[in-house]
């Protein structure tokens, strides 16, 4: 019994679909509660004020407000959402 497939066959030719990761709402943008801010693998961006983190590390807004990207320590970044009446 032959264990080699004949000519004209390749073991390549597969790829995974793009996962559409990245920042979805930018600094200064108004968002509503539940809006997805960042889709990511791991915590490239950490959750800040009024931002929650999902099981797949997605960051989402907990309140209506404006998006702000901030530094957290020396080399970490965080995303916060502040209500309209708070000065940034």
UniProtKB/Swiss-Prot annotation:
Question: Gene behind this chain?
Answer: rpmA
Q: Which residues form a coiled coil?
A: none
Q: Which InterPro entries match?
A: Ribosomal_bL27, Ribosomal_bL27_CS
Q: Which GO molecular function, any one, fits this protein according to its record?
A: structural constituent of ribosome
Q: Which domain of life is it from?
A: Bacteria
One GO cellular-component annotation of the UniProt record comes to: cytosolic large ribosomal subunit
The name of this protein is Large ribosomal subunit protein bL27
Keyword annotations from UniProtKB, A to Z? Ribonucleoprotein, Ribosomal protein
| Source species taxonomy | Bacteria, Bacillati, Bacillota, Clostridia, Thermoanaerobacterales
The record's section on Pfam families has: Ribosomal_L27 (PF01016)
Q: Which family does it belong to?
A: Belongs to the bacterial ribosomal protein bL27 family.
The alphabetized list of GO BP terms reads: translation
């Amino acid at each position: 019994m032959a264990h080699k497939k004949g000519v004209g066959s390749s073991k390549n030719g597969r790829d995974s679909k793009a996962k559409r990761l990245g920042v979805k709402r930018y600094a200064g943008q108004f968002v509503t509660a539940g809006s997805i801010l960042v889709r990511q693998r791991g915590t490239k961006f950490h959750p800040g004020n009024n931002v929650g983190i999902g099981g797949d590390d997605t960051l989402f807004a907990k309140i209506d407000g404006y998006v702000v990207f901030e530094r957290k320590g020396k080399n970490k970044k965080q995303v916060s959402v502040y209500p309209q009446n708070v000065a940034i």
